[in-house]
Curated annotation (Swiss-Prot):
InterPro entries: DI19, Di19_C, Di19_Zn-bd. Pfam families: Di19_C, zf-Di19. It comes from Arabidopsis thaliana. This is Protein DEHYDRATION-INDUCED 19. Phosphorylated within the NLS/NES region.
Length: 206
């Protein structure tokens, strides 16, 4: 392999690597500038044109008219386009990336819309805090939720019963203590009366 063929292969390799760096993202643009191939008159965007010339017109790529600036070029046409019109690669790449950003935004909006519809169908709270009014709670789901509440409800009743028992006991004590005092009073009076009777009977006998 001679030096010219090696140089030619190295040029092809570096050119293909550079074109891969500016590789476009799939999808059509609203406006995309196209250029006619100087050898077969087919139209391509700037990246497609360079790839087409590299693939189809490698041997005849010298001494052609540049489709961008319409000047006759004495060197390799692809090398001329990449060196003198490199801004077109960047511009096309920006357009593609901008379109891909728009597509991703649209897909996100569609996803949010789908999730919002799903939340409304299931009766969950929406993002602005409102609840779907048309959805009624499922009785089957509520029956699964309610047992936990009913199991925890007897505890307050038990505490209530204990407090009521204590209050009743206190009332009993209050009622019992006056009765016992009265009994004691009556017993004391009776004993005094009996003592008087006995003393009077004794004194009468004397």
């Amino acid at each position: 392999m001679d030096a010219d063929s090696k140089r030619f292969l190295a040029t092809l390799r570096s050119r293909s690597e550079m074109l891969m760096g500016f590789e476009e993202i799939d999808g059509d643009d609203d406006f995309q500038e196209e250029f006619a191939c100087p050898f077969c008159a087919e139209s391509y965007d700037i990246i497609g044109l360079c790839c087409h010339i590299d693939d189809e017109h490698t041997l005849e790529s010298k001494n052609a008219v540049c489709p961008v600036c319409s000047l006759k070029v004495g060197v390799d046409i692809v090398a001329h386009i990449t060196l003198h019109h490199g801004s077109l690669f960047k511009l096309q790449r920006k357009r593609k990336s901008r379109k891909s950003g728009t597509n991703s935004t649209l897909s996100l909006l569609r996803k949010e819309l789908r999730e919002g519809d799903l939340q409304r169908l299931l009766g969950f709270t929406s993002r602005n805090g409102s609840v779907a009014s048309s959805v009624t709670p499922d009785p089957l789901l509520s029956s699964f939720i309610s047992p936990t509440r009913s199991q925890s409800s007897p505890a307050p009743r038990q505490t209530k019963n204990v407090s009521e028992d204590k209050q009743i006991e206190r009332k009993r004590q209050v009622f019992i203590s006056p009765v016992s005092l009265k009994d004691r009073e009556e017993r004391r009076h009776k004993s005094e009366f009996v003592q008087r009777l006995l003393s009077s009977a004794i004194f009468d006998e004397v």
